[in-house]
Structures are given as structure tokens and as C-alpha cells.
Regions:
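Active-site recognition of the HExxH zinc-binding catalytic motif
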Residues: 75-87
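Metalloprotease/metallohydrolase-associated module, dominated by Zn2+-dependent proteases
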Residues: 2-71, 88-163
């Protein structure tokens, strides 16, 4: 039996519009942000892979992002877009401290410094996202449709007894 290819869903149009709006407001108008339908890691609200030299980023949101409040979605997307601005720091440090492949000590130092830079970058991005996010618009999310259940009304006739 032939395996069926996995069905790849497209990202919601309202999310793409919102990300494009925010990227322009955040000085990233010359960037291409590719919204990925595949969810981010289970322990993350979002993830972004940045290719700085190409002004390209792939953004992933967690699988249940549609259940988030507009404010939470705004916070996540502002945070992820800030990675586009700051990823160059990690890339520069990585290149400057590129370890000698035969030197275990330089590999260990490289790994430690990169981990420190990544950690501090996340803290900086968290702080910037929190302070500037409140000035950004919230997304125009589709209204949640409530399914109404058909209610069957039973009318009971009152029977009066004759006395």
C-alpha cells in the first residue's frame, strides 16, 4: 500500500496579513516572512528561523494559536519579528569565534558563548516585545462561530379532568 503524502495546511490569510502589517511597522518591510503551517516546538509559542543575509525568515506558531487572545498573538508575533533584527548578533559571534575543529577547548568555549548570547538575546527580545508590543495593533481575528443546537420543544397539553 502506497503511503499518502502528509497534508500540508496553509497558514490562515488573516495571520499573513497581520504579520505583514507588523513587519512593515517594525522596520522589516524589505524582509520576506514565510509563515509556516507546521507548528512550532511543543514548548514554544512561536519560533523563527532567520537567514539574515537574505532578509528571509520562517515563522512557526504553536498548534493552538487560534485559541489565543488577540493580545497574546500580538505579543508572540512581535517577539518573533524582533528575532529578525537581532539574529545578526548570534551569527556574528558564531563567525568570529568559529572554533578550530581539532581543538576541544575552543569548541567548548564557542558552545558556551553561543549559548550565553542566545539566552541574553531572548531576554532582550522579551523585554523589547513587552515594551513595544502594547503600541502595536492587535490582529483582526475571525469571529468564533457558535454552533447553535436545534432545540426540540415539547408542548404538553394540559388535560383538565371534568368533575
Amino acid at each position: 500500500m502506497a503511503r499518502q503524502p502528509a497534508k500540508v495546511e496553509e497558514m490562515d490569510a488573516w495571520v499573513i496579513r497581520y504579520v505583514n502589517k507588523l513587519k512593515n511597522m517594525m522596520g522589516l518591510s524589505n524582509w520576506t516572512i514565510m509563515m509556516q503551517a507546521k507548528p512550532s516546538s511543543a514548548d514554544a509559542l512561536g519560533e523563527t528561523e532567520v537567514i539574515h543575509g537574505q532578509h528571509l525568515a520562517k515563522m512557526y506558531l504553536h498548534k493552538d494559536f487560534r485559541k489565543d487572545s488577540p493580545e497574546d498573538i500580538r505579543a508572540t508575533i512581535v517577539h518573533e519579528l524582533l528575532h529578525c533584527h537581532l539574529a545578526v548578533l548570534e551569527e556574528a559571534v558564531h563567525e568570529v569565534l568559529k572554533p578550530d575543529p581539532d581543538d576541544a577547548k575552543s569548541k567548548a568555549v564557542h558552545k558556551m558563548v553561543i549559548s550565553l548570547i542566545e539566552y541574553e538575546n531572548e531576554r532582550i527580545i522579551d523585554s523589547l516585545a513587552e515594551s513595544m508590543g502594547k503600541w502595536m495593533p492587535v490582529p483582526d481575528m475571525p469571529k468564533v462561530r457558535v454552533k447553535k443546537k436545534a432545540v426540540k420543544k415539547v408542548v404538553k397539553k394540559q388535560v383538565r379532568s371534568k368533575k
